[in-house]
Amino acid sequence: MDLCNPKEIKALLGRHGFRFSKQMGQNFLIQEWVPRQTAEASGAAPGVGVLEIGPGIGPLTAQLARRGEKVVSVELDRTLLPILAETLSDYDNVEIVPGDILKTDIAALCRERMPGLPVVACANLPYNITTPVITALLQAQCFQAVTVMI
């Protein structure tokens, strides 16, 4: 499945009855080069864990999974979980964690889910939560690099 193809995305979301939430500021990446270049810039590599925030339907997650040792993605919108289960089923190094990153002990999450690995963070964030998320990531003091797309 091409996670950056608007027709395929529309069909996928329709099958799952998904509706965008204005409150969550949801937007999905539809240009293939954006998740690819973001993943390249993130520092994801063999032997490196990746914390991703807000995977959406998974195009950035898939790119990170191709590069990193393990990807832990935190997703607030539970209606996206069955979609992610479908779109990321080929990646056994991806773990989706339902929850709010702003209510998560980020350092503990990284220690528990990616023990012994150096970790980078990567996200495509809605504008309205950019500052608190970046602040939380920096306060966690557990990342080799933080890559955020706004």
Task: Enumerate the predicted regions with their spans.
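Catalytic cores of RNA-modifying enzymes
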Residues: M1-I150
